Structure formats: C-alpha cells, structure tokens
Amino acid sequence: MNPVALRRISPLILVLALVAGACSDGEAPDAATGSLLPADPYELPEFDPASFDALLSELKGTPVLVNVWASWCGPCEQEAPHLAAAHAEYGDRVQFLGVDILDERESARRFMHDYGWTYPSVYDLPGAIRDDLGLLGQPVTLFYDASGGLVTTWTGVLNEDVLRENLEMISS
C-alpha cells in the first residue's frame, strides 16, 4: 500500500479499533499478573474453549479441579457446600476453577456468594467449554494433575468422600 493511501485510512483504522475496544466487556486477563486466572473470584470473565485451554496450560505445575456448574442446577446446589469446604482445606495445594454455563452472571455471582465460594469461576453462557470437553449435563468435575493431565472426570453430584479421594490423588 502506498504512503498516501495508508495516511488516508489510518484514522479509519484508529476509529474502528476504538469502537471495538468500547464494545468489549472489558474483562481482559489480569493486567497486573498477565494471568488469565481472574484475581477476583466474582469477576466471572467470559471464556470460550480456546481461552479455557490457554488457562489450563497456564496452570500447569499445579493440580487443578474444574467444576462445571450453573446457579439454577439443583445437583450443583447439593455439591456446592462440599466444594467450598474442600477449597478451604485444599486450596493451598490445588487450584479450584469453576465454569459457569448457561446462566446469568448476577445469578452466578449470588450463588457463589451464598455458598461461600472464594475461588474463581469463568463464564461460558453457551456452554461451549463443556461441549468442547465432550461432557453432558452438569455438574461435572474434572481433576487434573500438576502436569496438566486429566486424571478423572466425575459426572453428577460429588460427595465429600469422592471429592477428598480425588483431591488427595491429584495433590500428592
């Protein structure tokens, strides 16, 4: 492209970039750490399968529990207190991460607050992360070892014993 044409379209490119930035939800990775993991557990940044995979890659070196849930899900409510208690016990050794699907953000935040969740969740309105993982329904909990390998998947309500057994397995 010649310099004259470039000078003519430069203002247009700038305007388009500003408009695109203004239309975003403003929920970029944490600028202070450069991490995709939200520093505020109630932030609920929007993720898709690609950003979720990038986050899992970023977390390699730490065991990870991923729980797929929704605020309107009865079985999710049943296991929520167990997850909060397990996080209090294992949170220094295992990164807990929720994936809120097919939900409204404010309902999800209220659910997290009501059950005392202090670990981050990401927001996936269409449920694309769950679908990309080949999972059906919710709750579903995935346990990853420190090398990033999927150790086991639990579909349905986690009881305390199953939760503790799997957390011990990935954190030892």
Regions found by a protein language model. Name each.
Residues 77-115, 125-132:
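Structural microenvironment flanking redox-active thiols in thiol-disulfide oxidoreductases
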Residues 110-118, 125-171:
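Thiol/disulfide oxidoreductase modules built on the thioredoxin-like
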